[in-house]
Amino acid sequence: STLVIKQGEGPDVTVKLTDNVQVFGVVPATLADLKTGAFIGVGAMPQPDGSQKAIQVMIFAESQRGTGEGFRPWDRPGTTMTNATVDTTVAGVDGQVVTVKYKDGEKKIIIGKDAVIRAYVVGDKSELKPGAHIAIVRADKMPDGTLQTARINVGRDGVVPQ
């Protein structure tokens, strides 16, 4: 299959889908959805006390457990990304305080009311239709110059995936 994607600005982009492409819906979520044992990705701003203040929290589908596990710089200046398993969660003055663990360590994350919380749910190719908001995490340039991807995120319930 092939998709023609209209970008906000710039030329349309054609992307081929691998035979085993994974499609994930991106849906609204809340703090109540952050359960102990959930695998999450948190884009955050480091705080002076060493904790991380969440900007965005993505709750992964169980089939995505382990994706990008660890702690590293994120795509915004001065920010970090932590993909890890929720160990504990406690209500705090500034929001929910969540401790996450990954293979090389753990982080304390503060999730305030201003954090965007979304969840991935398993989807299928039928969701890839004209007008759908999508995000492609990674596309490979093929020898003939075309792009190919094995994963697409598609917004549901008004969500525009990033």
Question: Model-derived features: where do they sit?
Answer:
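Short, flexible, surface-exposed loop segments at domain boundaries
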Residues: S1-Q162
